[in-house]
C-alpha cells in the first residue's frame, strides 16, 4: 500500500453513498505492516468498515483472488477497485451504481482520468479509451464495435451480485484481463454493460516499452486461452487506429518529439501481443521472460 491507496480509502469514506464494508485483498502482509497501514486506517476513520485478508504473491490470481473477495461479501451490489484508482469526487459510487439499481445494466465501469502528473501520451490514451459520454453495450453492438464491445475495466467497476454468481464470476485462473472475459460472458448471456462517464477515478501509468511488452504478452495469452470469446475478434486494427490518432494529436499539440517514443511503445505492444497469441509454441523459459506474472506460469508447471 502506498500513498495513493490511502487517498483512495479517504475518498471512499466521504462518498455520497458510502460503502458498508471495504474488503481488502492484500498481497504480502509484510508490505502492509511496513506501511503502517493499520494506523493509517484509524487516522482516516475507516478502519471499522475495512476487512483485510492477506495472501502471498504466489497465491494471487487476477480472477481467483477477486472471486475470493466477493465471497466475503453478502451485498446485492458490489464495487471493485484497484489500489491505485482514486475517486475524483464524492459521487463515484452513486453514479457507478445508478444503472444497476435502476435495472439498466448488470455491470458498470467508470471513466479513468489521467493523473495530473501523467505524461502527454498517457493523458491522450485515457481520453481515447474513456470518453465523456455514457452509453450502454449489448452483444448486438459487436458488429459495430468489434472487440471494444467487451471492453470493461475493473479498475473501477460495479456488479449485480446475483448475475455475477449465476455466470460463475471471473475465471478462477486468469493471467490477466479477467474483467473483459466476464463482460463478454455477461453480454453473450443477454446482459447489458454500462459505461458511466460521470463516475471518474484518477488512474494512469507511465510504462516503459519493456513493461508494455510484458503487459501485452499477458493480454494476448488471456485471449488465446479463451477462444470462445476472442477467436473471431481482432485487436490489431484498433491498435493501429489509436497509434495514428495519437500521432496526429501530438503533431497538433507541437509535441512531435514524443512520436518516436509513441512508436517504440507501440512496437513493444505489438510484439508482446504477437508472441502472447502464440504462447503455446514458446518454451517455458521464454514464457517466463515475456510475462509480467511469473507466478501464473509456475502454477502451470
Feature map (PLM): residue ranges:
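Short, well-formed alpha-helical segments that are part of the catalytic scaffolds
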Residues: 1-14
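Short beta-strand/loop segment that forms part of the nucleotide-sugar
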Residues: 19-30, 53-55
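Glycine-rich, basic loop-to-helix element that forms the pyrophosphate-binding segment
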Residues: 56-73
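Short aromatic/hydrophobic "clamp" motif used to bind/position activated sugar donors
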Residues: 78
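Conserved donor NDP-sugar-binding/catalytic core segment of glycosyltransferases
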Residues: 90-123
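A recurrent flexible, glycine/aromatic-enriched loop bordering the glycosyltransferase active site
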Residues: 139-159, 175
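Acidic donor-binding loop at a coil-to-helix junction in glycosyltransferase catalytic cores
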Residues: 176-182
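Non-catalytic, C-terminal membrane-associated alpha-helical segments of glycosyltransferases
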Residues: 218, 231-301
Amino acid at each position: 500500500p502506498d500513498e495513493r491507496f490511502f487517498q483512495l480509502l479517504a475518498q471512499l469514506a466521504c462518498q455520497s453513498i458510502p460503502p458498508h464494508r471495504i474488503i481488502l485483498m492484500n498481497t504480502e502482509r509484510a508490505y502492509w505492516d511496513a506501511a503502517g497501514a493499520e494506523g493509517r486506517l484509524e487516522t482516516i476513520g475507516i478502519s471499522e468498515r475495512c476487512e483485510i485478508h492477506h495472501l502471498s504473491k504466489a497465491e494471487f490470481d487476477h480472477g481467483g483472488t477477486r472471486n475470493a473477495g466477493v465471497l466475503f461479501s453478502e451485498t446485492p451490489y458490489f464495487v471493485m477497485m484497484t489500489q491505485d484508482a482514486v475517486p475524483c469526487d464524492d459521487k463515484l459510487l452513486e453514479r457507478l451504481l445508478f444503472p444497476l439499481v435502476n435495472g439498466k445494466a448488470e455491470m458498470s465501469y467508470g471513466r479513468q482520468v489521467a493523473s495530473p502528473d501523467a505524461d502527454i501520451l498517457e493523458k491522450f490514451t485515457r481520453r481515447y479509451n474513456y470518453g465523456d459520454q455514457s452509453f450502454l453495450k449489448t452483444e448486438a453492438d459487436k458488429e459495430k464495435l468489434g472487440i471494444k464491445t467487451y471492453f470493461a475495466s475493473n479498475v473501477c467497476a460495479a456488479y449485480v451480485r446475483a448475475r455475477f454468481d449465476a455466470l460463475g464470476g471471473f475465471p478462477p485462473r486468469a493471467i490477466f484481463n479477467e474483467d473483459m472475459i466476464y463482460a463478454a460472458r455477461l453480454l453473450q448471456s443477454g446482459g447489458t454493460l454500462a459505461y458511466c462517464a460521470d463516475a471518474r477515478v484518477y488512474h494512469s501509468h507511465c510504462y516503459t516499452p519493456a513493461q508494455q511488452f510484458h503487459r501485452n504478452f499477458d493480454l494476448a495469452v488471456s485471449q488465446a486461452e479463451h477462444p470462445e470469446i476472442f477467436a473471431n475478434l481482432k485487436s490489431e486494427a484498433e491498435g493501429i487506429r489509436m497509434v495514428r490518432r495519437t500521432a496526429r494529436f501530438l503533431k497538433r499539440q507541437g509535441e512531435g518529439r514524443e512520436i518516436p517514443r509513441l512508436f517504440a511503445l507501440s512496437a513493444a505492444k505489438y510484439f508482446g501481443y504477437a508472441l502472447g497469441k502464440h504462447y503455446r509454441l514458446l518454451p517455458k523459459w521464454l514464457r517466463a521472460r515475456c510475462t509480467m506474472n511469473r507466478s501464473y506460469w509456475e502454477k502451470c508447471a
